[in-house]
Amino acid sequence: MASPSRRLQTKPVITCLKSVLLIYTFIFWITGVILLAVGIWGKVSLENYFSLLNEKATNVPFVLIGTGTVIILLGTFGCFATCRTSAWMLKLYAMFLTLIFLVELVAAIVGFVFRHEIKNSFKSNYENALKEYNSTGDYRSEAVDKIQSTLHCCGVTNYGDWKGTNYYSETGFPKSCCKLEGCYPQRDADKVNEEGCFIKVMTTIESEMGVVAGISFGVACFQLIGIFLAYCLSRAITNNQYEIV
């Protein structure tokens, strides 16, 4: 058993570690809320783009929402473990932080590896959406209209892509291709945007996903601090047989 003097010397160290870990855990909890918000924002703001991507890509917002929720719950547990100054709970907290970090690392690697597949998938699906486009508006046709009107573009690579579609042969260009709102372009190429949507969509997705990736990377690195603090506090409590109830 540690001597009284040793325990008196250790008490300030444990108190300091406990205070720092509580501050960290609160910030960590906030990052969970941020990830949850980013996931919801991504689902809403990128919904039109995701509807033309493969199933793997559409899961990205749900992964962020799920991760944010787990972090919120884990942060609550970490706060409780720190307040209780429980060595085994702090070890469990550090273990969970490590698992989440590894999952985020694997997800980042997978996302980087399959980024070209996402681009190819979008281009292929967008081309098919143009071929099957109809004015009554299934979800893919609505997505095409939303993208073209929002990004002021027409077709995949340029407006000429529409000329090979059934819709063009029957009606002409869709209204979403118009340069000016409320026009009826029919087959008049002067009334529609010339630039295609593929490059613009990829630029938008890369920009938006860059924000998501940056936040996710920051959260992942931040977890390393928590792992270190939780481990140090747990070890200090165990080695010195000191427990605060």
Curated annotation (Swiss-Prot):
Any single GO CC term annotated in Swiss-Prot or TrEMBL for this entry: membrane
One Pfam family it belongs to: Tetraspanin
Cytoplasmic side: 1-19, 81-93, 230-245
The entry's keywords: Glycoprotein, Membrane, Transmembrane, Transmembrane helix
Transmembrane segments: 20-40, 60-80, 94-114, 209-229
Extracellular side: 41-59, 115-208
Subcellular location(s) per record: Membrane
Topology term for the membrane: Multi-pass membrane protein
Domain of life: Eukaryota
SUPFAM superfamilies given in the database record: Tetraspanin (SSF48652)
Cross-referenced CDD domains: TM4SF2_6_like_LEL (cd03161)
Glycosylation sites recorded in the entry for this protein: 134
Family in the record: Belongs to the tetraspanin (TM4SF) family.
Protein's name in the database: Tetraspanin-6
Species this protein is from: Mus musculus
